[in-house]
Amino acid sequence: MRAAASASAAVETVNGGRRRVGRGERGTVRTKVRATVTTGRGMRVVRAGAKIDFEDAGLFELPYAPVAETLLPKGPWKVVEGGVCAAKGFKVAAHKAGLRATGTRADCALVLADEDAKSAGIFTTNVMCAAPVTVCKDQLAGKPTARALLINAGQANAATGDAGMADAKETAAELSKSLGVPEEDILLMSTGVIGKRMKMDKYMPGISVLAENVESSVAAANAAATAICTTDLVRKTVAIELEIGGKTVRMGGMAKGSGMIHPNMATMLGVVTCDAAVSSDVWRDITSRAGSASFNQISVDGDTSTNDSLVCFASGEAGNAEIVDANGAEAKLLEDALTAVCMGLAKAIAWDGEGATCLIECNVSGAGDDEDARVIARSVICSSLAKAAIFGHDPNWGRLACAAGYAAPVKSRFSQDNLKLSLGPHQLMNEGQPLDFDAVAASRYLKEVTDVHGVCVVDISVGDGPGAGQAWGCDLSYKYVEINAEYTT
């Protein structure tokens, strides 16, 4: 499942600096929003009963990450349009309620299943988890299905105490009333500034607007993927189609994240919709494994957020016989597809890391088992020294070897005499011995990768064991410090 060595990309100017964005679906949209009111600050507010135009450039325009073109693993599926609306049985909406401190972009989204959908989730390991995370975990522990997911950007509703929990429950109650579905069928996600109460006077009216505007269009799916972003410079969405049990199954996803990204869920939100018929137990098991192989294998800056959440829905509307055998071929195929979608989105988050000029992919083989290999790969992509060296086009393989060596915990430590290490096409170490290599050519490889915001590939073998794993990160630039010195988290 290795990404290409570089990504074809366009270049745009962002905040005075050059930033690469994926070529393809650009979100260049031009339409009108009807039934708006202009406030004293010039902010357009859509009132209840109004029709939202999901192709309004002012609200929903954001470049597209090259998930389908470069980052999605290959498999027996094809890419289709539609994002989270590609699967049968789902509608979405997006809206600007006014929750962001600055900017004109929409800031809330709704994903709605036509009927009860099998639901599974994985969440942050941070003990300071946000109120919406607690609500989600409680809801999913109580029943295997859900109908709606309400997401907001701009305010995290984390470290807000009892009042924050009350706000979360109030938003769920408002959506329940607007949709006519039970509160226990509603899930919540939030992302944004930590430690401040939600702007309930703005959010609550926006909830009914969302409920009135759900649709299953490509434009709505792209609008939702844009609305949930914070410091992201690109929206992250993808959809695929494959055959399971003689039926066409579709799966789509969207994610947000650019900073505060670290293994064991990071400030990332992910949503996947699927129309396969699958038992709750199987769906939860494969969601857990797919998340472990993808979102838990990325890091931008080593900070694990309070709000990290991945929620996956399965509507069952594809018409296939329900998948109940966890060890069967159909369950394996469904898991492969879900893992691919999650990997594509997770890699897009690392690709879009704050200030990044490239994605770093570390592939580890020869470990005692897959988990050991993943631990080693994570250690390498988390190394600030290695990340800085790659940004500086310095083929400093010692930093890579060092990071592999201190990886912990692993069940079986590897011998340095077995270490093999390559940077792109350049082999730097074999069986623990440094090799003569063309440092100028290796530096040129790094420059070529960063010039196109491509993929820097690090291959490591630690022995002859059966374990293999991957992790993804990004380089560490001056821009990362600038962004986070100026942005309140």
In which residue ranges do the predicted regions lie?
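N-terminal mitochondrial targeting presequences
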Residues: 1-7, 33-67
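A structural signal for small-residue-enriched, beta-sheet-centric alpha/beta enzyme cores
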Residues: 49-170, 176-489
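Intrinsic-disorder/low-complexity loop/linker signature
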Residues: 16, 41-43, 246
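N-terminal chloroplast transit peptides
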Residues: 1-31
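A detector of low-complexity, intrinsically disordered, Ser/Thr/Gly/Pro/Ala-rich segments
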Residues: 11, 26-29, 34-37, 41, ...
